[in-house]
Amino acid sequence: MLEDNERVDHLIKEGYEIIQNDEVFSFSTDALLLGYLTEVRKNDKVMDLCSGNGVIPLLLAAKSTQPIEGIEIQEQLVSMARRSFKLNDLNDRLTMHRMDLKDVYQTFQPAQYTLVTCNPPYFKMNQNHQHQKEAHKIARHEIMCNLKDCIEAARHLLKEGGRFIMVHRAERLMDVLTELRHGKI
């Protein structure tokens, strides 16, 4: 089940296990906060964007019996998420799609979800001090998707009156608010 440099960490509160790999990218406090502070309602249909190794779907699965989906572009992270779902016997409820956020328009009908969560890359692509590892760059910097892409994907996926819950850095608050306004969310 584990590949090179992988380990199993425990989500103690939820009673779940998750496969992580520091060579690719491991979740941090911001992902935990997003998962812990997001309310999943009884009839929610849930999609997690920029899903990484699937930590948000796992955290949300502990709060609900609803099916939860995620979208992630990096193949290795998708594999880790899928294996974590299997490890926790959640394959019947959790699904991870390997795809570019820009492809949601061709893959998903509009207005199908009541809750969309997102832990996007925080740093602009041209920011100095990018990580040396490509997987870390993609997870942390707006290389494969930017804030606008995340918000537009959420808008496409959300039903009228649906909720979009995102975590981001305080210094990007004005960017977030501007894109939310442009995206009409």
Where are these regions (language model features)?
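Class I SAM-dependent transferase core
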Residues: 2-41
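Short secondary-structure boundary/capping elements
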Residues: 26-30, 52, 142-149
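Mobile active-site "lid"/loop adjacent to the S-adenosyl-L-methionine
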Residues: 120-149
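Conserved Class I SAM-dependent methyltransferase catalytic core
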Residues: 144-185
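Short beta->alpha junction loops/turns
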Residues: 23-24, 74, 169-170
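Glycine-rich, phosphate-binding/catalytic loops in enzymes
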Residues: 35, 132-135, 183
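Conserved SAM/SAH cofactor-binding pocket of Class I
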Residues: 36-118, 123-129
